[in-house]
Amino acid sequence: MSDAADKVADQLAILVARIKERMIEGGVVRSDETYIRYLDRIIPGGSARGYFWVYRGLDGDVIFDWQTSREHHHLADWLGADFEGILQSDGYEAYERYCELQRRRGKDVRRAACLAHIRRKFEKALKERPALVRWILKIIGRLYRTEAMLREHRAPPEVRARVRQNLSRPLIRLLGKAFRHLRATAILPKSTLGQALNYALGQWSAMETYLEDGRIEIDNNDTENDIRPSAVSKKNWLFIGHPEAGRRSAILYTLLISARNHGIDPQAYLKDVIERLPSMRPADLDALLPSAWAAAHRAKHPLAKPDRTATAA
């Protein structure tokens, strides 16, 4: 990144802080992480792995948080000791440990799992037991068809929860019972299928969270999609030039990807924000958040189509 971009990112940090406040207040955070190498002269070999920890809120806002490791405390430091609500993630143990820590503090925190990660584990085991794994994938497919129907009808959270209780809960229970039976039989624990079963059962309690709360998605794919632009840059850049550059990259990613998720042109949004931010009063800064900017843009241009690069929140 250029020096000019570094300075801009520092100015934009105040907006990222406000997005974080609103996300935490919303009570639902979806998280994932991805790595990219960074350069640092004080490290043997001159480079190491850094990580973008990514957090997504209910409305499509996304925050990229740069850290130089994948250590568990980064998650706890970001969410804080007062967070209550639902944390959706894959099976990386940092997420469940944070939820357990919060519950010991007397906080109402639950974790929601990701069915897409579970499905991928079984897809890898397809060659070992084709008929059995196809049956498992068929049941998972039925769960996803229910979600597609709910999206098609734009069902509100309370309807989603009700439909899931009627249609999806019996299938979740059926799969859980089947997984426990299979693990207790002759499936080798170290086989691909055995590993898939162990992973699924380790996630199954958290998998039921989406049945109970209609705000939650069946998987964490939206958050994974948010990470993909950084993966593209990772191929282009090969590395981040310095740990501090990682922090500034995270600030820009936060605003650009959030803008995209709200259906607006990220470049047009960022250009306008950079021009207006220096003269804005602190009390008026919320108008520059991606969600507010998108709403104002739609009010001015009611017939304009959403930017094609945007994804549904």
Per-region residue spans from a language model:
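Catalytic center-proximal scaffold of phosphoryl-transfer enzymes
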Residues: M1-A313
